Amino acid sequence: MKISIIGGSGFVGSNLSKLFKKNNINFQIFDNVKSKFFPEKYIHGDIRHNDELKEIADSDVLINLAAVHRDDVRPLSLYDEINVEGSKNICKLARENGINKIIFTSSVAVYGFAKPNTNENGEINYFNDYGRTKYLAEGVFIEWYNEDPVNRTLVIIRPTVIFGKGNRGNVYNLLNQINSKKFAMFGNGKNIKSMAYVKNVAAFINHSLSFEKGLHLYNYIDKPDMNMNQLVSITRGVLFNKPNVGLRMPAFIGKLIGYVADIISFIIKKNLPISSIRVKKFLSTTQFDSSLEIANFKAPYSLEDGLQKTLKYEFIEDNKNKVTFETE
């Protein structure tokens, strides 16, 4: 069995590739950015170009991790070109070459500002182009599956925010702020944040290779969820041996600071580490549910294990030459 990881040079793809190598699984990486970990497995290509996708026509399984997701993407048409039209090209490749299994990583962004404990049956209510185009891409793959449901397998995975070693997304930004000792807790800290450790996400993708024919849709969240008090306390415990939240301020103070930071940022034409949007995200509950137990999957790491490993790698150990992945 030959597996092609489309978008495999990125954060999730690199971790998945390491797991495949460990498990002696035959894989190749198709990406427009060279893999820093597996250059010998790398095939250069762009999912917007059908002629380049032909390089992986000999695949048995396609895993599509390729996506445009940053908030500052320009032109905005790239969301549709890559997330939607690229998915159509992948389905065309599968259709023309008898590839009957596709695994697609979507996102909980399709739910938008969802109610707590939203599961796979939650209302689709995206609020940005990323969520919109991820949902449209799901539809593209479902259309492909419905053409021959007797013989095809489609796995759609909607992860929540993913963190881990080398990632430079919102979770890292929070951990780095705490590490800088320029952090203050706003609010009562009881708001919950669903998260996913990257090695667990990779393990679930690997697990999904065994799924039988059919359409499989799962949110991916590492349970149990943490609230902000727990997240900050664990972080401070690892970094400073002080398992508490430290300085705490009322929520309205945090909001005020965020608005002031917005004004300063506008004047100096430079992004600051704090903003009204980041304060709003910090104070909000972002909690999802999942039916992962139906898939008979057990995550190899607890959420706390993943957090501790990430903190030690990023802020305690000497990893000067570490590879990083810029996300937002």
Regions found by a protein language model. Give the residues of each.
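Glycine-rich NAD(P)-binding loop of the Rossmann-fold in SDR/ketoreductase-type enzymes
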Residues: 48, 78-89, 124, 132-133, ...
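Flexible, glycine-rich beta-alpha linker
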Residues: 111, 155-172
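N-terminal Rossmann NAD(P)H-binding glycine-rich loop of SDR-like oxidoreductase domains
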Residues: 3-22
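Catalytic helix-loop patch of NAD(P)-dependent Rossmann-fold dehydrogenases
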Residues: 81, 115-162, 183-186
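NAD(P)H-binding glycine-rich loop region in Rossmannoid oxidoreductase-like domains
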Residues: 47-85, 93, 111
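Substrate-positioning beta->alpha
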Residues: 167-173, 187-209, 216
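Conserved Rossmann-fold NAD(P)-dependent oxidoreductase catalytic core, especially the SDR/UDP-sugar
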Residues: 89-129
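Mid/C-terminal beta-alpha module of Rossmann-like enzyme folds, strongest
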Residues: 208-273, 301-311, 318-328
